[in-house]
Amino acid sequence: MPTINQLVRKPRKRVTKKVKAPALRFSLNVLKGKLTRGKGSPFKRGVCTQVRTMTPKKPNSALRKIARVRLSNGMEVTAYIPGEGHNLQEHSVVLIRGGRVKDLPGVRYHIVRGTLDAQGVANRKQGRSKYGTKKASAVPAKKK
């Protein structure tokens, strides 16, 4: 337990919370070419610079699809491509949101399916909103 005198000399430090998706916090001032930190945004637009696969951490085994994305604020991040199959390639314009992938180190963002160049997952019936899939239209009735 510190004495009052010790606390006067060196006060207690505030515990700072680590930001989970830092790239969403910055915006680029194009005229000055400077990054400014603000309130942040829920999504950011970016261009894929590389689309590849990555293997997960120890107990799991798979080839997870990821993309390296250069954001509109100039930062480059690694984002996960959710769902089965995708149409993304280099120079595809995508929208990213925060959200890490637990078994992929360094992947802190998800690509939003069904927006910009990222198509929704084909033939998906349940949990469609997370994968950008439109509702399948009802089978038309036969005419007599």
UniProtKB/Swiss-Prot annotation:
Q: Report the sequence similarity comment from the record.
A: Belongs to the universal ribosomal protein uS12 family.
Q: What does this protein do?
A: With S4 and S5 plays an important role in translational accuracy.
Out of the domains of life, which is the source?
Answer: Bacteria
**From its record, what is one biological process in GO terms?**
translation
MF terms per GO, please? Answer: rRNA binding; structural constituent of ribosome; tRNA binding
Q: What does the subunit comment say?
A: Part of the 30S ribosomal subunit. Contacts proteins S8 and S17. May interact with IF1 in the 30S initiation complex.
PANTHER family attached here? 30S RIBOSOMAL PROTEIN S12 FAMILY MEMBER
The PTM 3-methylthioaspartic acid maps to 103
Q: Which UniProt keywords apply?
A: Methylation, Ribonucleoprotein, Ribosomal protein, RNA-binding, rRNA-binding, tRNA-binding
The record's Gene Ontology cellular component field reads: small ribosomal subunit
Lineage of the organism: Bacteria, Bacillati, Chloroflexota, Chloroflexia, Chloroflexales
Region called Disordered, residue ranges:
121-144
What NCBIfam families does this protein map onto? rpsL_bact (TIGR00981)
Q: Which SUPFAM superfamilies match?
A: Nucleic acid-binding proteins
Q: Which residue ranges does UniProt annotate as crossing the membrane?
A: none
Q: What is this protein called?
A: Small ribosomal subunit protein uS12
